[in-house]
From Swiss-Prot:
Homohexamer or homoheptamer. Organized in a ring with a central cavity. Residues 69-107, 113-123, 158-167, 775-785, 806-821 have a biased composition (Basic and acidic residues). It holds the Pfam family AAA. It is found in: Mitochondrion matrix. The active site is at S950, K993. This is Lon protease homolog, mitochondrial. SMART domains: AAA (SM00382), LON (SM00464). It comes from the Eukaryota.
Amino acid sequence: MIKASKCNKARALFLVRTSIPRTFIRNATSAIPTTVKLKDLSSLPPLTKSLPTNLPFLMPDTLHNLLRFDSKKEKQPSTDKSNDKDKPSRKEKGKDKEKENEERKDINEDEKYDIKEETDSKPTIDPNNPVSSKSSISSSSGGANNNNNNDDSDGRDDDGSPKDKEFLSPSDAGLHPPFLAIAMKDRPFLPGATRHLHVTDPEVIKCVNHMINSNIKSPYFVLFHVRDTNSEDAALDVIKDRDFVHEVGTLCQIIKTTGSEILVYPHYRVKLVDISTPNSRSERIEMEQDNSQTSYLKKFEVSYAVTQQLKDEPYDEQSITINAWTRRIKELYEKLAPKYEQPENKEEIMNNPSMLADFIASKVHAKPEQIQQILESSNVETKLELSLQLLQVEADADEMRQTALKNIRERTEKAYAQSLIKEYTKELLKAAGIGENSKVHKFDERIKHLKMPEEAMKAYKTEKERLGTQSDMEQNVVERYLDWLTQIPFGVYTKDSFNVKKAREILDRDHYGLKDVKDRILEFISVGKISGNVDGRILCLAGPPGTGKTSIAKSIAEALNRKYTRIAVGGVQDVHDVKGHRRTYVASIPGRIVTALTQAKTSNPLMLIDEIDKLDTTSHGGAARAFLEILDPEQNNSFVDNFIEVKVDLSKVLFVCTANYLGSIPAPLRDRMEIIEVNGYTKNDKIEITKRHLIPAAAKKVGLEEGRVVIPDETILRLIDKYCRESGLRHIKSLINRIFSKASRKIVEELEDTDADPHSREIVEESLVAKENESVISDKAKKDAGSSSIESNDSNTEAKVSTTTENEKKQEQKQKQDEEIKKLDLPADLKIEVKPETLKDFVGPEIYIKDRLYETLNPGVATGLAYNTSGDGDALYIESILTDSISSDLGNAGLHVTGSLKEVMKESASIAYSFAKQFMVRQFPDNRFFEAAHIHVHCPGGAIPKDGPSAGIAFTSSLVSLALNKSLPNDTAMTGEITLTGKVLAIGGLREKSLGAKRAGYTKIIFPKDCEYQLDEIPDEVKEGLTYIPVEWYSEVFEHLFKGISKEEGNSVWKEEFAKLEEKKKSKKTHTV
């Protein structure tokens, strides 16, 4: 039941929100008893001050229901005042003003009557469900209907009977009629603030326009947030199924539409009860929809849902937690208030905890999941806590921003003040004619020792004049340019030394072996001595890693008495790295060439361009083109760096390049170089280098005297064979260092064990005491000598010394001893010997366990030879087998190749297969092996990529061996490219392959006759014990590998298998007939 005061308020409410004459309302409501049931009032959307006053929240039909008219509904005038095509005249305005004054007078009378009614009957407060005594029917502007008000907001009358079933009125089960349901991916909408919604689905847009244009009295929809915002369908407006969205959303009213943009006002939170989608229609909703005012939704392919209003749980207004959090939120909000647009009902929001939580959550920056969590919460305390957390993060971020802005402002003001002081000081010094620029003086002093060309001197003077007339930033650029320009050693040269004898001594001192390399270098120096210079010569040291190319370049520089400088160009792809950046760029510097000259401080250094084969040529060859100019004797006398912008003469520079693989160097660059190949070291060379250089260097590095760690030749040999087979010395050097590190640890542990033995400790202490006595005596003698000199020079010193007590002296001496790190004194007889049997205790288990994969070769297995870019040679085994027996009559003869083979090696295998078939037909015509054999050829070591044509004769021999079912000799390895006609072509790396064959125990090597010239490059110690068999055609290879085989033997190998095959074929024919 509702009292008369509520009727009066409702009457005033209709007057404000509608255009119905007030006199009509007063006359109508005066006849209503005070006990009338008002079923529609609480179900209406809550009002808000932020919406337009001309928005018709209550339709005329609702008014008739309120007045309980049973007669036919009359058409009421439109309340839409937004269309103002016909502007009122001045007379009409005057009448409206008089009417407004009359209505205001009536409102004042109603308010007096309401105050009297409220005084007569004060609302009671339930302790479990506190209410606000300030209003009885008002709801929050955010639309959150609290249970705190003892009014009709629960959707039922005082007697518990259900209300009228208008479009917002809940059913008997407390459910709303079906509404249009829209899914959204962005931040969820919270009640109480007008928002813009963007929709893209054409059906949804049509439905919304229909609701607006058809004057539907229920322009409402429910909005739900998508669960998975990262899914492909997250941007859809139509809900696919119930699990597609969260269960809690908001009921929104459409205010205005503009294309795909909808201005909406979220009223309150709703819970999803049932949903009907275009893909899955709900029978329950469809049946109810037929009699519903929203039945028009069936016309569109949209989703619509039955919802239930989600109300806040009751809470205690006196709760300490709620009051504390509310107070803290208000404090933080006041600090951040300038950032946010202030609502008109701010006071009402601040006094309602639920509205305050929604308002704060709608303002702060947060993830959609966090806002959804607040939206789903019915507990006011929880909502406040979550909103406070978000607001606290916002406040902390704002504080950090303010601090950063303050620091920036302070730095800016300080820099401005410093610049003013600097300019003021500069003007004073200029006016006084004093204060010579120290930097300019430094530049002038530098050029006195240089022979700058005219172009460089002109640039220097021009830039020098600009100093003092530019801004600070520009002046820094000028100073940096002059600094670099005056560091270039124009006209500064070192005198060359062409002493061949001295050069030989330096090369022999620093390098063991490498006879061919040393001879080439000495020839180079001899030519320079005859011609008087080595200008225009560009050397390239090519060889495997770790063979000493860089150290050879240093020895050449020392032999020629030139400065040494190094440029690493591995991976360089930008031409500006070589030629510098222009001064217009921030923090630009010269390129690597000019920088190397400034480091060498001479114009004729030996400049090592290291790893030139690693130069990145993918970026349009920019860096490679720059080196074409630098390494060309006809062009490098006028090299121009982009930063310096003056010509620099590089013709006197001796360029030495290093590379591991010549094929990676661009051909134009390679043509400008004089190639000196630095091959790998032999086994004997490695042993001698280890003894002469690596062991002493490792002992010095760990602080041990030579002889403390003994490594015999047998141990070094085992280290080379089982751990370090590459041509270089880097790996063996690291292993030697590891041996000395382990030996140092063993020595320390052994001494610690000795300290634990009393007898041994006494011996060690006696030796240490004797050493200390010797040091004390020497220190005393020095002290006596020093004290006599002090007495003669200063008479007061003796008095000062006497004042120092003995205890202080002892403390100082002890402190000095603690601070000093003494070297460990080792007994003279303490040594560690690394034997071959104990080598694995120092460097770990052996890497190369077997030298040969096959001790005895089976038919179809051949031994080839291979080598890699690191200079390591090894045996390459070729295995061939039959995948099916010849008598199986499968009819799939062919070749299948595996073993991580690249394109060239696959082609080599195909060529060998074609030639082997032709060769067997010619040599053994009755051997029909290749007619029915499906062969699988494999190269062991599948993880290692293999390429190259040099395994051609090995492939052929493997196939012929399988066809003849005869094994190849165990002592013979082979290398050479094969052609379709059986010609054996030249290959490379014969020296490395010979090392691999000898290490694997092979004594004979079949190689192309065209490679006989390479035998002269192989050291005698490598050729010792090897027999080289040069061949020109494969028939010569066959004679060496298959000696004594007759035609009858070769023709009859597979006769039985082919006989069985023929019988099978005959039986098949008979069966078919």
